[in-house]
Amino acid sequence: MHRRMLTAAVAACLVMSQAVKASAEEKMILYTSMKESLIGSIYEAFKKKHPDITIDYQSAGAGKLMAKIATERQAGKVLADVLWTSEVPDFYNLKSEGMLEKYTPSNFDELINPFDDYDGSFTAARLGTLGIVYNTRFIKEAPTKWEDVFGKDYKGAFGVANPALSGTSYMSIALLIKQFGWEFVDKLAANKTKIGKGSGQVIDDTASGELVACIGVDYITLNKIKKGAKLGYAFAPEVIVVPSPVAIIKGADNLSAAQKFVDFLLTKEAQEIIASEGTLPVRNDVKLHPDLPISSAEEAVKRSIKIDYDALKDQKETTIKRFSDTLQGKK
């Protein structure tokens, strides 16, 4: 009898301890456009620091994630706790609609902040760059300024991803127009610049020799170089920097876990993972990828073309149409 009572008591204690443990565990839902190799590494590192937090992350293109959020809003509840993509205008839209929880990370003072109007609604978690990607078999001297792509060596063989399909391509075109005016696009057209499809495709075409150069994204280019592609990556004095913000959704069910994730994403450990993938970290105490042609992330931000995100958002449709018409000779 006593043994049965003791066994029952032990079993009850086990059930209670498991229930307490389950209640102590936190969960978090992350929507992100980051590639699997990056988010997978971040996830594993975060779990080691916070084994009591479970992350359910959903990785897709930024457009698909925003469509998902819109559908969830219509249904009455956004399921994501955290959003991390590279489409900065989306974050300004969500902010203006009251969809973001203000949170200043605990280590914010250690970070490089590219947003002059920062208010805690979202924080840059990495700094993507776009530069001139060139095939070293055809372009023997690395370009040093944007005007170099108007040269005869680039005629009919310089590519730009379609800004209607690629958000980063639209950002790069809009910033170059802001810096140099529409004359820059006119000169691209005069030199028979080609409009490709996505950001990856124009780099593939440059690696194959179909193009001799293109405007390309850093991490895609450096990954190609790592795999043996005969490519170079160069910055002009005016650097195109595209932040990748992270934000907490207003009314997040798992606010504490979300805050811990944002804090971790901005630590030296997480930023080293980000830098190893070929983008710029938001910390100066993290070494850059050796193939990035710049000395520091802070220098890149100082040299970057300044962005008016509201104008960028409002002018998108007209800018893309005029750009496409000009390059296609419809002007």
Regions found by a protein language model. Give the residues of each.
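Mature extracytoplasmic/periplasmic domains
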Residues: 240, 249-307
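A bilobed periplasmic-binding-protein/Venus flytrap-type ligand-binding module shared by bacterial periplasmic
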Residues: 131-138, 174, 242-254, 273-274
